[in-house]
UniProtKB/Swiss-Prot annotation:
Protein localization: Cytoplasm
Keyword flag Metal-binding: no
Protein's name in the database: Ribosome hibernation promotion factor
Xref: InterPro entries: HPF/YfiA_ribosome-assoc, HPF_long/plastid, RHF-like, RHF/RaiA, Ribosom_S30AE_C, Ribosom_S30AE_C_sf
Role summary: Required for dimerization of active 70S ribosomes into 100S ribosomes; when added to monomeric 70S ribosomes stimulates formation of 100S dimeric ribosomes. Unlike E.coli, 100S ribosomes are present during exponential growth, peak during early stationary phase and then decrease (shown for strain NBRC 3060).
Organism: Staphylococcus aureus (strain NCTC 8325 / PS 47)
Subunit description: Interacts with 100S ribosomes during exponential growth, as 100S ribosomes decrease (after 7 hours) also found associated with 70S ribosomes.
Amino acid sequence: MIRFEIHGDNLTITDAIRNYIEEKIGKLERYFNDVPNAVAHVKVKTYSNSATKIEVTIPLKNVTLRAEERNDDLYAGIDLINNKLERQVRKYKTRINRKSRDRGDQEVFVAELQEMQETQVDNDAYDDNEIEIIRSKEFSLKPMDSEEAVLQMNLLGHDFFVFTDRETDGTSIVYRRKDGKYGLIQTSEQ
């Protein structure tokens, strides 16, 4: 069962908003044979120009579903978030079920329901079943700090840069966010 943690910035989360979010995003449960125990982290932020930003993150066992949307209409934004999350689940479901069938395991996700196929509009310009890697590169990771990695990324004109963090000796990634600022992903072994 998906539980919800809903937080509002500059906005009070009313029962109507909470119910709408839970109803829409809760429909993702229909894609699973065994509904996972998961917590959907939902953050709703309003800006001075009345635009809203909705972020939803659902960490599952082997994948994290995440979608973000800005919209002038909160409810329309929630609908768009739901569509993005459903596309992510369908893509992931297809890959996992194919691997499960090849190994003879029980499928983790349910098969496509007829009503979902009828109501769905496919916004993807490519086949969800086929992942094609068109280019592969190999390079050595150089030890540096995150600031130097950002400079290297900008020099190369890339949106991300992989490097060995000099402080932790682990692999890290810096990336350019949509807002123009930078993010850092640090890896760890489990």
